[in-house]
Regions:
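Cap/insert and terminal regions of metallo-dependent hydrolase folds
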Residues: 74, 88-109, 217-305
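Acidic, His- and aromatic-enriched active-site or binding-groove loops in soluble protein domains
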Residues: 145-154, 301-305
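Histidine-centered catalytic micro-motifs
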Residues: 124-134, 209-217, 278-282
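Active-site metal-binding motif and surrounding structural segment of the metallo-beta-lactamase
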Residues: 81-147
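Core dinuclear metal-dependent hydrolase active-site scaffold
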Residues: 16-18, 49, 55-60, 66, ...
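Metallo-beta-lactamase
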Residues: 1-120, 149-208, 228-234, 254-273
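Active-site metal-binding loops of divalent metal-dependent hydrolases
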Residues: 21-22, 70-73, 129, 151, ...
Length: 305
């Protein structure tokens, strides 16, 4: 079976790259669910994974740059008040993740390291609104910020921090938000997905709803005739091989995670050359490099000190 082809024989995408705005250690049960309630393992485990990248995917189009996610803000490791500190919520944040971000690992610096100017970013797609995906927002006041309407609605709930959304780091003045709602589609190249959002109307960048990690999580399919199709998966999985074997991440709504995992796995089975690129998979850079896109990777696995 051939790869999913964009409906128009055009070539709007010139290059795809990945940069890393630091690393994050998380709990092993976060990567792969053991079936134990999340609050239990989060409060009792002493184990951490090794450093995992905080990936930002960079799509160079004929008209400028598009980002998928924006990384982690360095203020999260320099400002003691960045995360909630009191009560159960503060304890959960302290036990959930630990970050390493060097001074040269801002979004602006990472883009410059591969020859790009952040001023050329005209659109940033956010897979969801957790801190390790929204860290570059303050550097992108000139760009359209695209996210699922459901994710945007979560920000207006009474206690979004309980869902991992820190309003004070998201709802910044001067940002150009563009919430979208995937609509029914009949494109056979997107099956089994029945709803999608074509970002520019040319079929090259298509947003797919993959709820579970958060209710409004999105993935993005990059497709162009003659090129390896790419699926930027956010936190739908932390390891492609675990997803292929049907294993779920440890945080999120399990039924929705399971449905999204099945949909992504079905898409992958139909198109074996599909390169799936999660946000924190250490092998994602190598997988992209091995694709027909090649790429320029600036990913730090050993944090600079």
């Amino acid at each position: 079976m051939t790869s999913p082809a964009a409906p128009h024989d055009r070539h709007p995408v010139r290059a795809v790259s990945v940069v890393s705005t630091g690393t994050v250690d998380i709990r092993p049960q976060h990567v792969r669910s053991t079936g134990t309630p999340a609050l239990w393992w989060l409060m009792t485990t002493r184990r951490w994974t090794g450093p995992r990248p905080i990936n930002v995917y960079v799509i160079e189009r004929n008209d400028g740059l598009v980002l998928f996610d924006t990384g982690q803000d360095r203020a999260s490791v320099t400002d003691p008040g960045y995360f909630p500190r009191s009560g159960l919520t503060g304890l959960i944040y302290r036990r959930l993740a630990r970050f390493e971000i060097a001074p040269d690992q801002t979004l602006t610096a990472r883009l410059a390291a591969i020859g790009y100017d952040i001023a050329d970013v005209h659109t940033a797609v956010l897979s969801h609104l957790h801190t390790d995906h929204i860290g570059g927002l303050a550097e992108l006041r000139h760009a359209d910020l695209v996210l699922h309407q459901r994710e945007w609605d979560t920000l207006s709930e009474p206690r979004p921090e309980a869902s991992g959304l820190l309003r004070e780091h998201i709802d910044l003045p001067g940002l150009r938000w563009r919430p979208v709602t995937p609509q029914p589609v009949t494109d056979p190249g997107l099956a089994p997905f029945t709803a999608a959002h074509d970002l520019f109307g040319d079929g090259s960048l298509v947003l797919l709803p993959t709820p579970g990690h958060t209710p409004g999580s999105l993935s993005m399919l990059v497709r162009q005739p003659g090129a390896t199709p790419l699926l930027m998966a956010g936190d739908a999985t932390f390891d492609v091989h675990l997803m292929q074997d049907g294993h779920l991440p440890g945080l999120g709504e399990r039924a929705a995670l399971r449905a999204s995992t099945r949909a992504l796995s079905t898409l992958w089975a139909r198109y074996p050359d599909l390169a799936i690129l999660p946000a924190h998979d250490p092998a994602a850079g190598m997988r992209l490099s091995a694709s027909s896109w090649g790429q320029r990777t600036v990913a730090v696995t050993e944090p600079q000190r």
